[in-house]
């Protein structure tokens, strides 16, 4: 440590608040670690001062008197204490081992019976640089608490939670100011104890510093309204901006909140219990991020605001002087005010979001600070440290001839688009409405269904001359929707039909292979479509349910089938008018590509030349409402990444100059393709031309028009005399080329760095703030697992549909047809062959069929057995007739529009078992169990809605929209009559979509150990809810006490997710009304079960959450905590709306005797 140098100290200070022993332990108070991070985490950043001294100079020692040092100590905190320490770094450091290289500056209270550390500044040693990492305070009688202060050029400005520590280092001598405050005043005649300061090298003993090396000073108490002085604003007409009204915590002087704020400057007593505000401080703990040095920085920060938000502030300050370079403040009372001086900042408010962008180009060190203040104080703080360095001026090399002007980054190119239709089905359980049987005449169907739907969907119709149907039959009629739910159908449209047929039939073959796999796994058709069906179902179900509830409320009469028809058509049509192509996310389309096994080099994307939804189909019977949707997508071929550019010079064979070209480093061609989802979508690509063949004579262009372009070697070339970066200009003596390392400006053009041009461009498929691809894929797998549990094994009719689809696909793959007529003729021949196959389907491998086969062979040579053969033939024919009547026989009738099909009686139990056994083993079916390859269909009256449908989710009519501006996915609102019979459950049903959004954030915060525990619970809970009461008697008692809450909305604030090997559960903030008041489940705590591990039940989760509350909570990384021996906790605050309901989760009610007993 003899080498002179500078020391940069970054201190992250955490002052731990622990309640006194006299009060009972509250929620999480027991779990609070005594040696971990505090509940009020404050982050400090030191101001570095570089000084040097000679090798011969002795360490700096205080030469002034103690009183002079006290007087010179700055007033950096109001109503608190400050320690000023000037000393050498301990010499024992050199003798310490690598594991012991930690030094603690400790403040001890010598007046106590036991010597306890009340303030420690822990620093870790890395070579010759000492970085202060953590400050914590622990004491039982006199506790250190954070003061409300800040320090700027040695001038105190009282501020809510912003703090600084000044550290000046000179070799191994340093000066540190440590602010602190006592948690309570001394009782009786006691005085404040004078702490002693020392260091601990890991040996366990305290080495004290000489008193001449430090002073302890009590700061004067300051009062008055707090304000911030900032540079003049460019927005004010007078040149100055009054920022006094934009305070970090703007409160009216006459309000009671001001008195509460002043009380916060007084140390908090140890007897104060753990409360919500401290819990939120844990959740929204400050995070300091140090960014890599760069030439220029573009900073971004976004906050979600609420009705309680008072002010949001963003600012960039230069270091070490803390001068404000630019600042933007949004205040709910005074609006937006922006100040730009040495950087540029912009502020955008969209709905409930505040977004800020700051652009810095001047060299130096800066702090990017953002905070949100609510009526309860600061709830969010973000700090980023960034250093701007000077960019190097380029050295140009001789300028070549020709080139192009780059306009975009390299982007993916997609060619040869061919349409593909993806079908999905949506079902509603109408039995929940208690409807009488519905019966429609053809005239009523036309009046209430066909005509309104046609008028509403007129803009989505496809021109018939361009439409070509391969005849797969999965999208022709409502019946096909009924049977082909969750299935995949294809329709082709192309000018070159023969060429396209050959390509698309290959896709159909691969689709058949995938469907065979689905049968083997006992999954429904179209496995890749289950998750998007679920998403679309939520949207349409909300619209449908909201319309029906609104109608019920207005009419106050029993709803009829015609009402459902009109409202359904109107709401769905209105919704589909505004739907956009982005309703299908890129990750979903990629999953479709993987599931149907597209050839290498082909992808699926939305169709930009047609509406995304075509011809919705709607139908219902007494118990089920079915909606069929057709999504139009495009299959394209992926080419290498190219970038769009403007032509400089011209190609030899092209006249006139093409205005735009697509090019890579070596070739280019003239075309102007539209951009969709960060890709160029081109119908065809011309033959590319080498860039080396550009016109050589370009001297005229050089003289008359300054240009910037890219050479075939990937260099940036220009004929400008100068280029600009940051706030300075680099002079260029002559035109030339160079390899850019940073963004540069030349005239109106920007030089793109070659490292960006030469690398492959990866389109941004997910939210730019956080890549959630892996999370969404996991959700898809979970949705598939849920579908398996809900639907179980396939019905016989669905298996027949798969076999038929496979047969037609295979035959069509062998013969490419040229027209619709030929395709229909081919399918008709297939149907005819199927009839013959059914006639000769007597051989199924049984003993009788084997015996008849032997007899047939023998009868060819032995005529004497003809009589026996005739007898057996008549016997087998009767068996065939019975077997055929019980088999899945489907008849096909060709019509001009669609197909009309029906299904005969179901097969026997014995045949059904044999059919399922063959489906599981993926073996070829016996002929006796094969269905005719016609379009299988269920009659609507035979459909069982209890097995394969989802019930309609209703919402509270008084709350039609949630915070996101759309209808909510709420629990069913039970009628008043249903409350007369109590159910075993009283719950708060929650919005699953919001919980899913929170889950996506949680997963990004997990480390490997937490993720391993997280993955153990994969059995999802179908309904997300708080259980308030359980049991018939308990539920009845709950209703008697809290009847006014039944059916009403409740706002709940979730604190985060508890992760245990048994299961996952959200837990709310403690002491939250009215949840604490309504919760009446013994031996449990309020929680929302999300998923459970195998061999565990949901009822276990309440005890698990209650038991883990007694464990310690240890910080792993920001927002992730170790809780208990195997559990974890992820802090993820989420405000969610629920509805209190007595709806039985298991669709059961309490016995009538319990109701009578309650009534008596």
Swiss-Prot record:
Specific enzymatic cleavages in vivo yield mature proteins. Envelope glycoproteins are synthesized as an inactive precursor that is N-glycosylated and processed likely by host cell furin or by a furin-like protease in the Golgi to yield the mature SU and TM proteins. The cleavage site between SU and TM requires the minimal sequence [KR]-X-[KR]-R. Glycans are attached at residues 50, 95, 109, 134, 148, 232, 254, 304, 323, 621, 664, 722, 771. Residues 23-853, 1070-1127 are extracellular. GO terms for biological process: fusion of virus membrane with host plasma membrane; symbiont entry into host cell; virion attachment to host cell. Residues 230-251 are annotated as: Disordered. The mature envelope protein (Env) consists of a trimer of SU-TM heterodimers attached by non-covalent interactions or by a labile interchain disulfide bond. This is Envelope glycoprotein. It comes from Walleye dermal sarcoma virus.
């Amino acid at each position: 440590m003899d080498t002179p140098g500078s020391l940069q100290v970054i201190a992250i200070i955490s002052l731990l608040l622990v309640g006194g022993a006299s009060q009972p332990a509250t929620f999480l108070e027991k779990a609070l670690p005594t040696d971990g991070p505090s509940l009020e985490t404050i982050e400090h950043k030191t101001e570095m001062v570089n000084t040097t001294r000679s090798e011969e100079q002795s360490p700096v020692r205080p030469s002034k008197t103690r009183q002079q040092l006290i007087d010179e100590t700055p007033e950096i905190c109001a109503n608190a204490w400050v320690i000023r320490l000037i000393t050498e770094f301990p010499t024992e450091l050199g003798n310490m081992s690598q594991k012991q290289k930690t030094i603690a500056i400790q403040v001890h209270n010598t007046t106590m019976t036991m010597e306890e550390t009340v303030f420690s500044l822990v620093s870790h040693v890395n070579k010759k640089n000492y970085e202060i990492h953590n400050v914590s305070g622990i004491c039982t009688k006199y506790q250190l608490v954070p003061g409300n202060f800040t320090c700027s050029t040695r001038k105190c400005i009282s501020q809510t939670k912003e703090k600084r520590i000044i550290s000046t280092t000179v070799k191994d001598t340093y000066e540190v100011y440590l602010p602190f405050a006592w948690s309570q005043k001394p009782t009786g005649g006691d005085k404040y104890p004078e702490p002693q300061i020392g260091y601990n090298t890991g040996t366990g003993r305290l080495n004290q510093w000489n008193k001449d090396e430090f002073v302890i000073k009590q700061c004067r108490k300051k009062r008055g309204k707090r304000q911030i002085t900032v540079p003049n604003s460019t927005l004010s007409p007078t040149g100055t901006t009054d920022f006094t009204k934009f305070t970090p915590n703007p409160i009216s002087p006459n309000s009671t909140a001001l008195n509460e704020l002043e009380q916060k400057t007084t140390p908090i007593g140890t007897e104060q219990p753990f409360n919500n505000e401290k819990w939120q401080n844990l959740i929204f703990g400050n995070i300091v991020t140090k960014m890599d040095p760069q030439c220029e920085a573009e900073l971004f920060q976004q906050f979600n605001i609420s009705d309680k938000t008072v002010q949001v502030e963003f600012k960039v300050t230069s270091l070490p002087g803390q001068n404000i370079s630019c600042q933007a403040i949004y205040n709910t009372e005074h609006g937006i005010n922006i100040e730009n001086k040495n950087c540029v900042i912009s502020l955008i408010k969209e709905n409930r979001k505040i977004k800020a962008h700051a652009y810095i180009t001047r060299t130096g060190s800066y702090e990017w600070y953002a905070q949100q203040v609510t009526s309860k104080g600061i709830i969010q703080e973000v700090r980023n440290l960034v250093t701007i360095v000077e960019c190097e001026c380029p050295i140009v090399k001789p300028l070549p001839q020709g080139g192009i002007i780059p306009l975009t980054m390299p982007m993916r190119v997609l060619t040869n688009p061919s349409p593909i239709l993806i079908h999905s089905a949506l079902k509603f359980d109408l039995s929940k409405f208690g409807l009488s049987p519905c019966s429609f005449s053809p005239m009523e169907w036309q009046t209430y269904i066909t005509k309104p739907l046609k008028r509403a969907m007129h803009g989505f119709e496809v021109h018939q001359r361009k439409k070509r149907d391969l005849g797969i039959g999965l999208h022709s009629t409502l019946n096909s929707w009924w049977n082909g739910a969750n299935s995949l159908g294809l329709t082709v449209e192309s000018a070159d039909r023969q060429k396209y047929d050959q390509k698309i039939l290959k896709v159909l073959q691969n689709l058949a292979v995938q469907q065979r796999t689905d049968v083997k796994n006992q999954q429904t058709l179209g496995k890749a479509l289950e998750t998007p069906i679920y998403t679309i179902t939520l949207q349409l179900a909300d619209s449908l349910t909201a319309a029906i509830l609104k109608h019920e409320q207005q009419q106050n009469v029993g709803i009829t089938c015609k009402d459902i028809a009109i409202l359904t058509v109107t709401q769905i049509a209105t919704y589909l008018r505004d739907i956009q192509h982005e309703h299908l996310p890129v990750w979903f389309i990629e999953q479709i590509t993987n599931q149907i096994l597209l050839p290498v080099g082909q992808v699926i994307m939305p169709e930009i030349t047609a509406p995304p939804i075509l011809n919705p189909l709607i139908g219902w019977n007494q118990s089920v409402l079915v909606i069929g949707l057709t999504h139009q997508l495009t299959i394209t071929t992926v080419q290498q990444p190219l970038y769009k550019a403007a032509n400089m010079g011209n190609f030899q064979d092209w006249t006139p100059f093409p205005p735009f070209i697509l090019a890579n480093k070596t070739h280019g061609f003239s075309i102007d393709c539209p951009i969709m989802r960060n890709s160029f979508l081109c119908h065809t690509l011309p033959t590319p031309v080498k860039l080396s063949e550009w016109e050589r004579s370009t001297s005229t262009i050089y003289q008359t028009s300054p240009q910037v372009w890219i050479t075939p070697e990937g260099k940036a070339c220009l004929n400008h005399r100068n280029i600009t970066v940051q706030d300075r200009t680099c002079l260029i003596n002559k035109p030339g080329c160079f390899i850019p390392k940073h963004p540069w400006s030349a005239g109106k053009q920007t030089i793109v760095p070659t490292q960006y041009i030469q690398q492959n461009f990866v389109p941004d498929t997910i939210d730019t703030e956080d890549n959630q691809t892996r999370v969404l894929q996991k959700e898809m797998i979970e949705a598939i697992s849920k579908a398996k549990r809900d639907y179980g094994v396939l019905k016989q009719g669905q298996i027949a549909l798969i076999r038929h689809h496979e047969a037609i696909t295979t035959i069509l793959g062998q013969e490419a047809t040229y027209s619709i007529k030929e395709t229909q003729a081919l399918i008709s021949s297939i149907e005819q062959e199927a009839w013959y196959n059914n006639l000769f389907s007597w051989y199924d491998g049984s003993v009788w069929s084997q015996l008849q086969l032997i007899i047939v062979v023998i009868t060819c040579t032995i005529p004497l057995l003809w009589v026996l053969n005739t007898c057996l033939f008549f016997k087998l024919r009767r068996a065939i007739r019975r077997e055929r009547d019980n088999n899945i026989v489907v008849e096909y009738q060709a019509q001009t529009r669609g197909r009309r099909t029906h299904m005969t009686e179901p097969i026997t139990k014995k045949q059904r078992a044999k059919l399922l056994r063959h489906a599981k083993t993926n073996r070829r079916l016996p002929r006796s169990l094969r269905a005719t390859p016609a379009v299988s269909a269920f009659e609507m009256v035979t459909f069982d809605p209890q097995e394969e449908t989802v019930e309609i989710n209703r919402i509270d009519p008084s709350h039609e929209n949630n915070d996101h501006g759309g209808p909510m996915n709420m629990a069913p609102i039970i009628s008043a009559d249903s409350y007369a019979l109590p159910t075993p459950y009283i719950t708060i049903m929650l919005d699953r979509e919001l919980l899913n959004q929170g889950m996506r954030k949680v997963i990004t915060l997990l480390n490997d150990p937490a993720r391993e525990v997280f993955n153990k619970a994969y059995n999802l809970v179908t309904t997300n809810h708080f259980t308030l009461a359980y049991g018939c008697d308990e539920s009845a008692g709950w209703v008697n006490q809290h009847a006014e809450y039944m059916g009403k909305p409740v706002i709940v604030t979730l604190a985060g997710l508890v992760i245990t090997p048994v299961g996952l559960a959200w837990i709310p903030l403690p002491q939250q009304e009215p949840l604490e008041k309504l919760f009446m489940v013994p031996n449990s705590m309020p929680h929302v079960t999300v998923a459970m591990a195998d061999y565990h039940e949901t009822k276990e989760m309440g005890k698990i959450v209650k038991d883990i509350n007694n464990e310690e909570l240890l910080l792993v990384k920001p927002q992730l905590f170790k809780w208990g021996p195997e559990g974890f906790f992820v802090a993820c605050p989420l405000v969610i709306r629920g509805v209190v309901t007595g709806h039985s989760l298991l669709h059961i009610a309490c016995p009538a005797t319990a109701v009578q007993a309650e009534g008596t």
